[in-house]
Amino acid sequence: MTPSISWSLLLLAGLCCLVPSFLAEDVQETDTSQKDQSPASHEIATNLGDFALRLYRELVHQSNTSNIFFSPVSIATAFAMLSLGSKGDTHTQILEGLQFNLTQTSEADIHKSFQHLLQTLNRPDSELQLSTGNGLFVNNDLKLVEKFLEEAKNHYQAEVFSVNFAESEEAKKVINDFVEKGTQGKIVEAVKKLDQDTVFALANYILFKGKWKQPFDPENTEEAEFHVDESTTVKVPMMTLSGMLDVHHCSMLSSWVLLMDYAGNTTAVFLLPDDGKMQHLEQTLNKELISQFLLNRRRSDAQIHIPRLSISGNYNLKTLMSPLGITRIFNNGADLSGITEENAPLKLSKAVHKAVLTIDETGTEAAAATVLQVATYSMPPIVRFDHPFLFIIFEEHTQSPIFVGKVVDPTHK
């Protein structure tokens, strides 16, 4: 290979899926009452909260009439790992685009934060299945910088595969097999086509299989109307749950807020805006409010109705990350000289993010959570998620947002 050739890098960031799961009966309980208060955890949660909301708002800006589903953890992990081999403006843009203040946080602490987060997500003794994986696919005649390789393995638990990108079908199969296996077959054909000058690919996936602590009874699921907009209504299977639930109305957001726990240490926050208040919710929601919802748990007698659904997201990260200031890595001025020892310039030719979500009735009986139980209404409220709503799924120990979504039409997969 000669220095005049420009090589391409393919980034498959955040190939993720979230599906319901039945847990084994003999699974051991873990103590989830203690939040992880280490500086690394606090740092990553703060930045990921900002990053998740900026990314969400950019997706809304690009299309306000579509379902949204993505994993901020996966996207941030992939770009942070890539930053290990970047230099100059390319390096600065990546980390600042991920909402890190480089005057307050050292690069070493950033990577330690991601290392700690990935270790937390991949804990084998959790009551739910939550796992991540990073794969580096390197052309068989390309020599990587040893420091990049070491740090990618150490901080990001990366696996390295030697492939022949000249045989594009064979290389594509190796990458797709890695993702398909990691997501247990939920995401196939992550790569449909490889650019002919690709010599290096990075793939990141996240798999989450969880069960509700308070399950929905399938016998109570009935067909109901969901109002996509003022003129469009669709029929959906609507799940129903009654009892002591963590649901309240937030006047600041003009929205109902519902918190539902998965077995283990993961919580889903659902946000249902009042009529005509979706834009207000999207503009007002911030990480401080979300943190308060997670910390100040309260239950009251209520009934909720929420659609059973399967949605997915498929995004071109070049158009998504550019408004966040991450641009240099995608053009010929990219400095990724810390990745390979070769002289030819390397740029990120393509970056894609694919995500799949399924929400249904399955769950486990709840062990009583330690919460403040209050009754706000004289009559139990009935909250119907029968028009567009948002949701965020958090890992509770680190309070990191692992999934973010918006349901506009539950019938669109």
From Swiss-Prot:
Family classification: Belongs to the serpin family.
Gene: Serpina1d
Protein name: Alpha-1-antitrypsin 1-4
Region (RCL): 368-387
Record-annotated site: Reactive bond: Y377, S378
Organism: Mus musculus (Mouse)
One GO location term (cellular component): extracellular space
Biological role: Inhibitor of serine proteases. Can inhibit trypsin and chymotrypsin; relatively ineffective against elastase.
Cleavable signal peptide: 1-24
Glycosylation site residues: N64, N101, N265
Pfam family, one: Serpin
Domain comment in the entry: The reactive center loop (RCL) extends out from the body of the protein and directs binding to the target protease. The protease cleaves the serpin at the reactive site within the RCL, establishing a covalent linkage between the carboxyl group of the serpin reactive site and the serine hydroxyl of the protease. The resulting inactive serpin-protease complex is highly stable. Variability within the reactive center loop (RCL) sequences of Serpina1-related genes may determine target protease specificity.
